[in-house]
Curated annotation (Swiss-Prot):
Pathway: Metabolic intermediate biosynthesis; chorismate biosynthesis; chorismate from D-erythrose 4-phosphate and phosphoenolpyruvate: step 5/7
InterPro entries: P-loop_NTPase, Shikimate/glucono_kinase, Shikimate_kinase/TSH1, Shikimate_kinase_CS
Primary gene name: aroK1
Key words of the record: Amino-acid biosynthesis, Aromatic amino acid biosynthesis, ATP-binding, Cytoplasm, Kinase, Nucleotide-binding, Transferase
Compartments it resides in: Cytoplasm
One Pfam entry name: SKI
Organism per entry: Syntrophotalea carbinolica (strain DSM 2380 / NBRC 103641 / GraBd1)
Molecular function terms, GO-annotated: ATP binding; magnesium ion binding; shikimate kinase activity
HAMAP family, per database record: Shikimate_kinase (MF_00109)
GO cellular component term of the entry, any: cytosol
Swiss-Prot/TrEMBL catalytic activity: shikimate + ATP = 3-phosphoshikimate + ADP + H(+)
Superkingdom, natural source: Bacteria
Top EC group: transferase
This protein's name: Shikimate kinase 1
UniProt EC number: 2.7.1.71
Length: 170
């Protein structure tokens, strides 16, 4: 197996954490599209949004997706990667897509505990729980239609990785 693996899901669903662990077990490379964008633009996600707006950020996000796609790579995508139809089609056509499903309350707790959450701009200007519920109402269907597989991202990392390996047939 030398496929590309894409992890999709909301902010704080565990894409980066699970991605690193899965890549390690598979002996694959790991890339986080937000980290890639920050490294190539020399700006944080918040700075890109402040300077270029959400349209500019989404453009950079799509460019990053294409740039990092490679065989034997696990890619943690930004939470909004699925908003562009072209990105959804691209991921499905170029690899296996896993949706990390996590309850809103769990994501809210993770965001509250994340020291980097200040670098992640609010999408709606609301409280964390309100924002997560609003964003998930908009994106849940897109995550489901994009994914080849759905993982329970609220269990320990090792169990999520095992779920993914079982689904991949290994």
């Amino acid at each position: 197996m030398a496929t590309t693996i894409y992890l999709i899901g909301a902010r704080a669903s565990g894409k980066t954490t699970i991605g690193r662990a899965l890549a390690s077990v598979l002996n694959y490379a790991f890339v986080d599209t937000d980290e890639y964008m920050s490294a190539t633009s020399h700006m944080t996600v918040a700075e890109v949004v402040a300077k270029e707006g959400w349209v500019g950020f989404r453009r950079r996000e799509s460019e990053a997706l294409h740039a990092v796609t490679a065989p034997k790579t696990v890619i943690a995508t930004g939470g909004g990667m699925v908003l562009a139809t072209a990105n959804r089609k691209y991921m499905r056509a170029h690899g296996k897509v896993f949706y990390l499903h996590v309850p809103a309350e769990v994501m809210a707790e993770r965001l509250k505990a994340d020291p980097n959450s200040a670098q992640r701009p609010t999408l709606t200007g609301r409280s964390i729980v309100e924002e997560i519920n609003e964003v998930m109402a908009e994106r849940e269907t897109l995550y489901h239609e994009t994914a080849h597989y759905i993982l329970n991202g609220s269990v320990p990392v090792e169990r999520v990785v095992k779920q993914a390996l079982d689904m991949l047939g290994g």
